[in-house]
């Protein structure tokens, strides 16, 4: 599952950070379910901010199970006026899912610093 949203005329910085907080508050639940979320918060032109998920990887789960797991998050976002367009896919194998979700990429640069974090339960 992949999606993105950002600040705009209808999404204030305050609303954006409330949405990020709603995601962060659910880390223990998503971690316990064995999910892997590859995401970033980015600063754009002016004071624009964006959040991108590329992808939300849920090994050993069906798409229906992942949608059920994330339903409350997407409801909270909808209540905040955020309805990201979600790209979904389901795969028969770990390798197939990994290959579809994690393209090779250049990481980091002069204005970007990439880091990984492990959040304990």
Describe each region flagged by the PLM.
Residues 1-121:
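Soluble FAD-dependent oxygen oxidases
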């Amino acid at each position: 599952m992949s999606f993105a949203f950002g600040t705009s005329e209808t999404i204030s910085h305050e609303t954006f950070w409330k949405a990020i907080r709603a995601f962060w508050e659910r880390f223990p639940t998503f971690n316990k379910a064995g999910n892997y979320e590859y995401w970033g918060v980015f600063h754009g032109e002016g004071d624009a901010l964006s959040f991108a998920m590329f992808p939300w990887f849920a090994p050993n789960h069906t798409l229906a199970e992942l949608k059920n797991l994330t339903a409350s998050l997407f409801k909270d976002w909808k209540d905040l006026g955020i309805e990201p367009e979600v790209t979904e896919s389901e795969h028969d194998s770990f390798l197939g899912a990994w290959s579809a979700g994690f393209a090779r990429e250049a990481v980091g640069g002069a204005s970007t610093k990439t880091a990984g974090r492990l959040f304990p339960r």
